[in-house]
Amino acid sequence: MLDDDERHTPAQQDFRCPSEEMTVPPPRGGRRVAVVGAGMVGLATAWFLQQRGVEVEVIERREVAAGSSWGNAGWLTPALTTPLPDRSVLRYGMRAALDPTSPVYVPITLEASLWRFLAGFARHCTTRRWRRGMVAYRSVNRQALDAFDELGAGGVDAPTRPADPFLVCFARDREKQAMLDELGEIEQCGQKVGFDVLTGSEARTSAPVLTDRVTSAVRLHDQRFIDPPRYLAALAEAVRSRGAVITENSTVLGIRDDGRQVVVRTRKGDHRYDAVVIATGAWLPELGHPFGVRIPVQAGRGYSFTVPADRVPEGPIYLPTQRIACTPMGRRLRIAGMMEFRGPDEPLDRRRVHAIVNAARPFLDGVDLEDRHDEWVGSRPCTPDGLPVVGPTTSPRVFAAGGHGMWGIVLGPLTGRLLADAVVTGTVPDELRAFGPLR
């Protein structure tokens, strides 16, 4: 996943599988596959293809992890991996969404594709559709951390750290109750979540970086986190060490299926492969559209920076009302947040950085929010229904892997494992049924 997000496209169509049995012909001839995009999803797909004996080349328009994989919070939290469209998003209202200091921001624009995406997104902000999406996530959430363990056992030299503790913090009782209600709904959909409730004092004892503005917290069990740049660098090195070429700073201009192979066009010429995986994040529709991928993929941009802290917490801290995520990164604290629906290539908006600073300041003690390093914006690929876009397209040799929204890091390795199975065997795993690119 070059960046785990995608650009916009026309309205959704009903999902039609390549066949009723969810099978596609495996690539003919040899086993040479191109993966377009070198973020978490793309690199994990490459690694699992190699695990199955496939020769892989990765093509990246910038550098490894240059997109939404690099600066995100690095949370491996199946407990929180849910469809993005829900009723709480609509509570912000249009006036709040047009405010650049709001956690969810939509700049005033005449871009029709953005408004089509937002209309589709709003239609999915219902309890019924959220539950249907949650059921789709349930099976992949159960396996997500196992895929990281497989990468580690296979030589990816970067740790996943236990999130001990992982604290979801609140200033008001009603905020806590909203989270408890959501966790209850997740469990009603069949996904178990381990947690306990802390007082504000207990939360501050567990994480002294918190101020007394935190009156209560939910401590999630059995979650993890990573340092994204370090992890992605190790994953790329593991892919290279198995013989793959990762070609950076190379833009794919087009993809064509000639009936026998797939032709990938770059500025340096055409290259032939037995199959291609499009894992370009928020730019996925540009290459996927000719192969029937009509699902709008919109950049949901997130911001982050790192700051020094007198007492770096042992695990992540989440402020859900403020949409602020804090992750320990060595001696510094990465602070990330916001959701901004606009073009994936737009420059960083400093108002959004300041909005994070102002929202986080009342809750964090001993943190120098003015000493910011690594200020970053990345484009998360969001879909109207909040589900990824993973599987075969109208071509049996072209596959899509993207649209994970905020969950490209936690679901990237499992996506790679499942999609590698589909490419090699020609059979789409049951876990990917709801995520079909032709839905």
Regions found by a protein language model. Give the residues of each.
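Extreme N-terminal leader/targeting segments of oxidoreductases
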Residues: 1-33, 51-52
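N-terminal Rossmann-like FAD-binding beta1-loop-alpha1 element of flavoenzymes
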Residues: 31-57
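Glycine-rich FAD pyrophosphate-binding loop
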Residues: 51-71
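Active-site substrate-recognition segment that forms the wall
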Residues: 72-75, 80, 84-123, 252-262, ...
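Rossmann-like flavin
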Residues: 115-237
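A conserved beta-strand/loop element that lines the FAD pocket in flavoprotein oxidoreductases
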Residues: 240-252
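C-terminal catalytic lobe of FAD-dependent flavoproteins
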Residues: 321, 364-439
